[in-house]
């Protein structure tokens, strides 16, 4: 499940937690959404609390890369350097598509994060959310 935006997280925090603990296997969100969900001021505090939940948590961090938490292990991935960002539309969606493509092909989490970062870097170099 994707957290969508911080306002949605704020309105439905209790429901998100119930889903996360009982029904979901995978949660994806950006740093702000995760901090809002966990009601923490910084990502490290949020991640430390999320490590105890036995789910795959994926956190995008814009130019600061991405993070995955699984089985009490935190995996970091640097972002792909983009000289000029043109439009952020579609960056999260392309990250997720790259991540899940590799995940479904049974690649390790680091490779999944890298592919997500590569695709999101491609889309932010142009206007719009289509690669072609």
Regions found by a protein language model. Give the residues of each.
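Conserved phosphate-binding/catalytic region of the ribokinase-like
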Residues: 14, 40-132
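Conserved beta-alpha-beta core of the PfkB/ribokinase-like small-molecule kinase fold
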Residues: 1-47, 64-65
């Amino acid at each position: 499940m994707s957290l969508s935006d911080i306002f949605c997280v704020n309105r439905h925090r209790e429901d998100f937690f119930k889903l996360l603990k009982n029904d979901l296997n995978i949660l994806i969100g950006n740093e702000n959404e995760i901090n809002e969900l966990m009601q923490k001021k910084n990502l490290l505090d949020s991640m430390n609390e999320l490590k105890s939940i036995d789910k795959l948590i994926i956190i995008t961090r814009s130019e600061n890369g991405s993070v995955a938490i699984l089985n009490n292990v935190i995996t970091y991935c640097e972002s792909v350097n983009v000289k000029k960002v043109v439009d952020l539309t579609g960056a999260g969606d392309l990250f997720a598509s790259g991540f899940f493509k590799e995940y479904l092909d049974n690649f390790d989490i680091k490779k999944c994060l890298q592919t997500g970062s590569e695709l999101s870097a491609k889309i932010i170099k142009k206007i719009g959310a289509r690669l072609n």
